[in-house]
Amino acid sequence: MSLTTYNLIWNLLELILPNYLERRKKSGKEDIHRIHERYGISKKNRPAGTLVWLHGTSVGESVAALALANSMRKNGYGNNGNEYFLLTTNTITAAKLIKDKIKKGLPAIHQYHPYDHPKVVSKFLDHWQPNMAVFLESDFWPNLIYLTTTFIIMFGELFHLMNEWGGFVGNS
C-alpha cells in the first residue's frame, strides 16, 4: 500500500475516530484526561535543551526504552539539567510504568503516542521538536516514521533488533 493510499484511509478514519475513542474510554483502554495527546496536542511545554524521544508501544517495549534511558544516563546524558527524554507509549499500563520512573528522578516527560494521521504527527513533532528519536517497537507507523525522518536527522528504529534480541533472550 502506498503512503498516499494509507493517508486516504486515515482521512476516512477521522470521521469515526471520536466514536472509537469513546468506546475505548468506556472500556478503560484510554486515559480520559489525556485523549488530546492522541491528536498530537500536549498540555506540557517542551523543556529547553536537548530532547531525546524514546518510543515504545507497550510495557515490554517501554521497559526497553527505560533501559536505554538509564544506560544513556550512566554515560552522562540527562545529568546536567539541560537534557531530557520524551517517552511515548500506547497503553495505560506502560504509561504508569513510565510515570513511576519519572517520579524516581528520570528527567523525562511522558506522552501518549499520537495517531498516525499526518496532521496529528506533524502537530506532535512541531510541538516537541525532538533532537533525536529512537523507536523501540515492532509496530509499523508509516507517517510517524516518515515525518520523523524528515524532521530530525538522528533517528533509529530498533524494532528489528528487538525481534532478534527477543528470540535470543527468550532462549536464555
Predicted regions and their residues:
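Short hydrophobic helices that act as membrane-entry/anchoring signals
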Residues: S2-K25
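Active-site and donor-binding regions of nucleotide-sugar-utilizing enzymes
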Residues: P18-S172
